[in-house]
Amino acid sequence: MQNSTLFRRAAALLLTAALALTLVLPGLAAYEMPIQTVNEGESVYLFNADIDKPILEQNADQQRYIASLTKMMTALLFLESGKDMNAEITIPASLTQEFKDIQNANGSTINLRIGETVRRIDLLYGLLVASANDAASAIASDVSDGDLTAFVARMNQRAKELGCTSTSFTCVHGLYDYGNVSSAHDLALIAKACAENETYMQVANTLSYTLPATNLHQNERTITSTNLMLNPEYPYYRDYIRGMKTGFTTLAGRCYVTFAQKDGHTYGLVVLGSDLDNIYREASEILDWAFASFSDRELVDTETPLTTAPLKKCRSYEEVELYAAAPVSGYGHADDKVTFTYDLQENISATVKNGAVLGTATVYLDGYEVGTVDLVTHQEYVSDFRTDLQSTLLLMAALIVLLAVLSFFTLVAGGGSLNLARRRKARRR
């Protein structure tokens, strides 16, 4: 029994040391790209949006053209401007040349016209659902009082505020094959800011939308999302897709940013430089793999000791074994390592009661903090003084009993001798 206890203590110390060595940096696990084929020139960035953890990266910091993904920033600034989205604006004459340039470049539009009165919210739907370049220009003009250059400057400033280091904008829509550049990593930063805006996500997650009639459009018009993964009739449709944005130009290739949410967990994905035949296949395979490979699992139970702590004033035990007061679960890959840091009470002296809280353990999964749990004992540890006192009291009690027994027999024996002497004396008479 003593050898078994010593072995458990040694094993616990070795485990604690090993775990301390492994807790260094987040993102320790390396996951292989789970898709059938991917062009080595593409940029891919998959991240767990709940804890901002990178999962897959390929050329994630490479600067490249981003086409209509530009409109994510345009929409973000529009929503952050504080303007009333239900109010109407009139398309100004100052956009005449801008609209001609968009038309000459064969850019997608919702056919806005100079002098047309439209609601801001309809411009936002046109921007994010139909990827309309004229809607982008109208939005920028509205926010910056007609100065598109000032709006572009604000786009670049906002990108820096979000931590982007490879991003530069020269126009508000990304239609032209020059200027607007970013990286998969930077676009993830912009996407996270967009995802925090409820209106953005509601609009971007819309499959189709009806634009109301205006003073220059007598009939309603229905626009359909360029994000085909929102379409149930499309082969790569996924019900976990949550909006965001598509983009395409000759130099940029097919670009895609999306969020995906399932069973309470959210991923963000950026793919740049793909092609029409593969962009949605790649996205669906990557996200399917993520939801299949990562799951909720119990990381810590309450029956296995996590660590030990030195114990004073107790000859029977040199240390106390500490257990988690409650189970701890986390979401991760089967290969993710569980590590701990401890905050233990100092100068622990017996007596220690069963269930005493003697510290905390912070639990990490693949280097990312999951939570903190109390550390408790599963038995009582009695002090030397109490043990010695109990032993002394037991010994004294035993001596008292022994003395009582001896006294009893002495009295009995003494009484018998006295009776015998009396009988002998009586016979002599």
Residue ranges and their predicted role:
Residues A20, D61, D84, N133, ...:
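A general structural signal for well-ordered secondary-structure junctions
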Residues L13-T22:
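Bacterial N-terminal signal peptides
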Residues Q2-L14:
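Bacterial N-terminal signal peptides that target proteins for export
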Residues N3, G27-H185, L189-E198, K262:
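Active-site-adjacent loops and short helices of periplasmic peptidoglycan-processing enzymes
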Residues C164-S168, Y176-R428:
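Domain-terminus/edge residues, biased toward the C-terminal soluble/receptor-binding domains
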